A protein has these predicted regions:
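Short, C-terminally biased terminal segments at protein or domain edges
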Residues: 1-124
Length: 124
């Protein structure tokens, strides 16, 4: 459906994932199977679901996978806030990540709205 490297939303999600890997590298080793693993999994899920949706043959399926990616972004947002509250992640590191996530969520929503219009136009 789309070339991944041309999807700005996918590129931004990849960059976010790299940033999450970097910040979680400094988390306590006791969190290896906790917040480190959960945060990284949620982060990886975002571009992965965008990619899977883009590889599908319908706008409806793509829209569904964007919804899953968006859900993962909210999961990641929550995990990063928890890490901050537990003093594993300072505000200086947290705030840019939250801004990045917020921007990605807005882009995802906008993309979903565009796909929804295409889906509805096909029904006519």
């Amino acid at each position: 459906m789309n070339k991944l490297n041309e999807l700005k939303i996918w590129t931004k999600a990849i960059n976010l994932t790299v940033d999450v890997y970097k910040v979680t590298a400094s988390f306590p080793s006791a969190e290896r199977f906790g917040l480190i693993s959960q945060s990284r999994r949620a982060a990886v899920s975002i571009p992965s679901n965008i990619a899977e949706g883009a590889g599908r043959n319908s706008f409806k399926e793509f829209n569904n996978f964007l919804g899953i990616a968006n859900g993962s972004s909210y999961e990641l947002q929550t995990q990063l806030v928890i890490a901050n509250k537990l003093e594993m992640l300072d505000n200086e590191s947290l705030n840019p990540l939250l801004m990045h996530i917020d921007e990605l969520q807005k882009m995802t929503y906008g993309f979903q709205q565009m796909l929804e219009k295409k889906i509805n136009n096909k029904k006519m």
